[in-house]
């Protein structure tokens, strides 16, 4: 059976762990030559080894994203390792600060926006021209379910993901006519790949009452990324796929029960 990303090349940022790692592994399993990138060299090489051991092709590039120079350097080194072209770009790198609005200082604000938004913007700027010259490509951004639901924590992080989802639509309009499909994935509450199944995940509380009722697995996000990167998604542009167990778009069971409960006065 033909693999869906056979003979394609891909760069996945923030792919030394968690969702990014599973996306890189998923791409490798579907035939893509993958560049794994991140700050932890040991973990990055372990992801490369995992892909190669399964018969795939992968290389690692160290990248500490946040500035324009780092984005451009990563794009250049990745393209060199991939034979001069990057068919698929996944903007996954991101950081989540443990601060509230009242406790966030300027350095933290700038760092989070630099990694979560600025790096994606300038990496896309660096990669898109070669994609256009090659006849097209696919760019996949990682948003988040909390970009569209107000929570008392994570205001800074959620605002960056809202920006990324807005960029997705803008880039689809800008680059779609030039052959580049731009879409995003909005993950819900996702278990870390190495989480002890006998220990309750703190984020599970946010899934109570949602249709899925429990956190998802990173493999669900990887499957969505493979789909968006493949020719199967040729008619999908400017979309944000909610892979969140129904958390954002469906009333919780408690809310639904309140809505459907008969009026006592009737």
Can you describe what each PLM-predicted range is?
Residues 129, 173-177, 234:
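Alpha-helical segment proximal to the catalytic Tyr-Lys
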Residues 149, 237-266:
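Short C-terminal tail/terminal secondary-structure segment
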Residues 144:
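Residue(s) in the substrate-gating loop at a strand-loop-helix junction
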Residues 100-101, 105-113, 195, 206:
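Substrate-binding pocket helix/loop in short-chain dehydrogenase/reductase
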Residues 121, 215-243, 248:
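C-terminal substrate-recognition "lid" of short-chain dehydrogenase/reductases
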Residues 9, 16-18, 40:
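Conserved glycine-rich cofactor-binding loop
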Residues 124, 160, 168:
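Active-site helix of classical SDR
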